[in-house]
From Swiss-Prot:
Covalent carrier of the coenzyme of citrate lyase. The modification O-(phosphoribosyl dephospho-coenzyme A)serine is found at S14. The keyword Cytoplasm applies. InterPro entries: CitD, Mal_deCO2ase/Cit_lyase_ACP. This is Citrate lyase acyl carrier protein. It comes from Leuconostoc mesenteroides subsp. cremoris. One of its GO terms (cellular component) is cytoplasm.
Amino acid sequence: MEIKKTAIAGTLESSDVQIMLSKGTVGVEFDLVSDVAKQFADDIKSTIKETLGLYGIENAVVKVVDKGALDMVIKARTLTAIQRALDAVDQPNWEVL
């Protein structure tokens, strides 16, 4: 699937993550800001890539501002951003959820 518009999900509050998805052309590109990036950057990126893969999104620019979010929060925020970016908020993919 292809991203139709730029979308944001999440907040900048403690224990949350803000994810912005935009159209990409060369795979999935990340801009990650996190106090724990040295320790968890690969895990954060992996969770987001896996979630994008569930929707068949292969090209995207992902800007992530992490404030210590747990894996399940990262996945939930990514799912929300994807649905907004695909303009499918009213038509969720129940197989993915």
